[in-house]
Amino acid sequence: MIIFDKPSISPIKTKAMGRRAQLGTDATCRQSVMYDTYRMTARDIVLFLFVFLSLLSCTSDNEPSVTTTNRQTVTVAVTPTLDCLPFLVARDCAIADSMGIELVLIECGALADCDTALISGHASAIMSDYVRAASLRDKWARLMTSQTAGEKQKRTAGDKTVTASVDSLVVFPHQNSHLYMFVNRKSRIREARQMADKMVAVDRYGADAALAAYVLDSVGLTGKTYLVQMQNINTRVMMIENNMMDVAVVSEPYATLLRKTGHKQIYSAAHVKSENVGCLIARKNHQLIRDMYNRACDSITKNGLHHYDSLLIRFSGVPPKAVETMPRHKFLHLE
């Protein structure tokens, strides 16, 4: 009988087989780790794409629309007076935005600065008065004449890049600006006929001087009165507050400020219905600016003047107590 024993395996072969088994196990582990790593990376990529698309959708919602990016820029020069309040309301209460307008306000201390901004082209429109409007029309006519002559000379010289100016000056009268004449509280003046040899702070090239001349002529004043040129309305108020002027012509809200501090009002143009002291002068975008101003006037009429006290306080620098006691004003549309 032949008996076959189990083949004996030498220690060397056993060691080699163990190493191969270990290598096989390591390879399997590496494949598993690589698979796990690949699976985690794919998961991260999917998560990243989800977050990215979410952010992209949010960004697209916040991006301005086509109408917003194509908004028309309108620059208006204003003074710190009540008749300019509709432009503040249009800018800060989204009226201009709703009309597709990017409204930029140039804050000037005097109407003369507004005239300069309009003539130089820095402003599309300004708030002014009827006296300055007449003077500005003459300046504008001379400016257009000189520009036309210069353009003709350049065309004659062969410059084909010259184009004619398309801007035209349009004046819109309004009744939202009223002038008041005040006498210093320490003065003995009680009425206009006592203003002989007195100094009156006015803008000599504006409606202020016209009002002062009208008041003095209406009482038949025989003595001489000195109209002192002070274009900046804040300077006028400061001079009469410091007792350096006898009389000053101002508009709201500075008229209320002088009343609060004890100065005497001797004339008011607020109750003269035919008095169109103020006006808006535009050189471009005429109807667009007119419609924006009128919409803001409707908003003030609807909500009340004192709803916008904070805008007027910040704009004019008049103390809150004076602005809060200012009489009610009805804002009318531009004519």
Residue ranges and their predicted role:
Residues 23, 32, 153:
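Cationic, low-complexity basic patches in intrinsically disordered or flexible, solvent-exposed regions
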Residues 24, 34-46:
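Bacterial N-terminal signal peptides that target proteins for export
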Residues 45-53:
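Sec-dependent N-terminal signal peptides
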Residues 56-57:
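C-terminal motif of bacterial Sec signal peptides marking the signal peptidase cleavage site
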Residues 60-70:
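Sec-dependent signal peptide cleavage junction
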Residues 69-222, 227-230, 246-252, 265-269, ...:
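Short, glycine-/small- and polar/acidic-enriched structural segments
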Residues 287-335:
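Secondary-structure end/capping motifs
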